[in-house]
């Protein structure tokens, strides 16, 4: 999955961009706790372990089971 697709998934769930430093983007949610950090160029492929971590942070556990 590309970084662009991960960002789209997170934003559709209500997360919004809070801050950026270099290639790292941190997203916040109005109701959910914590931050979701996504790094890399938009066209980069996200490694499987990193993708699992991002999905756990954002609360998308159902996607992990697929």
What are these regions (language model features)?
Residues 34-35, 41-66:
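C-terminal structural segments of small proteins and small subunits
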Residues 27-31:
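Active-site beta-strand termini and strand-to-loop segments that position acidic
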Residues 14-19, 62:
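Short secondary-structure junctions
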